[in-house]
Amino acid sequence: MKFLLGTLVVLATFVTLCNSQCYFIPNQSLKPNECQDLKGVSHPLNSVWKTKDCEECTCGQNAISCCNTAAIPTGYDTNKCQKILNKKTCTYTVVEKKDPGKTCDVTGWVL
């Protein structure tokens, strides 16, 4: 019972910290069983795919929904540091602007 309670507390904390960045594209495809993304690529209805920009998209009846899958760093010195997205691993690193070989402290991440 304690294990179950502990698991629920961790899950609730994780859900509270999540703040996905999503957007919707109205489905303007002339075909009823597919969606067309902004690049003109057709996707079957109810399909899910990942983009090269670290987004996961879903083709729905009325729209395509896309959400960011890379955790975005927050709580770092934006004057001194910059975030860099590695599109191969869908992860950010935060480095000094003047010396990109040095990493910066990050106090939070938002998904």
From Swiss-Prot:
Enumerate the Pfam families for this protein.
PSP94
Describe tissue expression: Corpora lutea, mostly in the luteal cells surrounding blood vessels.
Signal peptide span = 1-20
> Where is the protein found, in the record's own terms?
Secreted
Which cysteines does the record link by disulfide bonds?
Answer: C22-C67, C35-C59, C54-C90, C57-C66, C81-C104
UniProt keyword list: Disulfide bond, Pyrrolidone carboxylic acid, Secreted, Signal
Superkingdom in the source lineage:
Eukaryota
Q: Which residues carry this modification: Pyrrolidone carboxylic acid?
A: Q21
Query: Gene3D superfamilies of this UniProt entry?
Result: 2.20.25.590, Complement Module, domain 1
- Broad class of the protein's primary localization: secreted
Q: Tell me a GO cellular component.
A: extracellular region
Describe the protein's quaternary organization and the partners it interacts with.
Homodimer; Interacts with PI16.
Belongs to which family?
Belongs to the beta-microseminoprotein family.
State the name under which the record lists this protein: Beta-microseminoprotein
Question: Could you tell me which species this protein originates from?
Answer: Sus scrofa
